[in-house]
Structure formats: C-alpha cells, structure tokens
Amino acid sequence: MKKIALKNAARGTAFDYAGQSWILLENDDGRALCLSKDIIETRAFDEGNCNNFAVASSKEYLNGAYLDNLLEDVNGPNAFLTTEPDLTTDDGLKDYGTCTVTIFLLTVDQYRRNRDVIPNADDWWWLSTAFSTKSNGYESLARRVDTDGTLYWYLACYGLYGLRPACYLDSDLLISIEDDEATDDVTPEHAGEIIAALAEQFGGTFATEDQLTTALSFMLGTLRATREKEARHE
C-alpha cells in the first residue's frame, strides 16, 4: 500500500475514507467527485412521492443520520465539502434549481460523464435527477440506474431501490491504495501546477527549448520525489 493525494489518483481508483469504500470519479478545481463503491441500503427517493431532491426524504437522511455516522468515522481532517447539485430535469426544466448538501445522489449528467469508471451494482439505485417537474405534470418520477448500468425512471416513493451516496472530497486528502493503482502519468492538475511554477520562475518565457526541457525535467523529478516520500510515510 502507498499513500497519495486524491488529486494524484487515477479515475476509477477505489479507496476507503470515513469507514466507507469510495470510487474516485473526477477531480475538479481542488475537489474530487466520489461515489460510494456499493449501495448502502434500500430506501425511497422520497417517502412523500416527490421527485424534487431538494426536499426529498433521501436528501434529509443522507445529510442527517448518514453523514453523522460518516463524520464519526473520520480519522484526521474532515475532507467532506459542501456543494450545490444541479437539479435540472431530464427534459431540461430548471424548476427545482439547486440545493446545498454534503452528501447527495449523482445527477444524470454526472453519471453519464463518469459511466466508464462506475461499476455496476447488484441492485437498482437512485439518481437525483427528476424525469420532469410538477409544473409539467410529473411530480413523482425520478431517475434510477439498473443493474446493467442503463437508465430508467420510477415512482419516487418506491422503497426497494438503493441509495448510492456521492460526495465531494478535498483533493489534497491522502488516501491509501495498492502500489499498482498509482498513476505514473502527470494529470492535468499536475501539468497546470508545473506550468505555473515554471512561469513564476522564468517569467513565463524561455530563452531556448533546452532551457524549457531542463526546467520541466527538474519539476517532474521533484514531483516523483514527493510521491516517493508520501509512500515511505504510509
């Protein structure tokens, strides 16, 4: 096992945090979108059959008792970040706006964007996106993911579909992974950091191509040394 920062891990990397197993879906501007590796339990999207995640009973549960349990199992700094998921419906209506949460269900867009690294589950599970809205005659249909990964919809009050929580974590969080899971490639985030450091050191210009190559090699060497140091302090 070795420790690396979440921002240095490859998409699809599985890791444990706060007593639960997560999958890294994507890194974005200092935060990492993560999905529970498994369905945690079966529960209605909303016990009142409302497909608006902003007021759904599943949202209240995930950000209440469930989040409290996660925080109790945090060993070290709390890396959970708040966010505002976009609740635009399947047909493009924006009646439901956004809501402020820490734990949430993936939107359809987040699911589609990261489908290539999301393993199928052994049961159906909810997304936070509604089929349409009450103003359009659909106040009860919410999106779900089937066991083969395909998308469907069903009544929000149905209590036999799973909750598969998602969250944003601070991308500087150190996680433990198997050695062969570590990425050897420079991620876009790393590349940006390298370019910024080079620009600061050389004023954004290089006299020759050799100068650029030398500086870049130095920065990459520093990055590798940092990773090796993290591994030694596992």
Model-inferred region functions:
Residues 87, 219-230:
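Short, leucine/isoleucine-rich alpha-helical interaction segments at C-terminal helix-coil junctions
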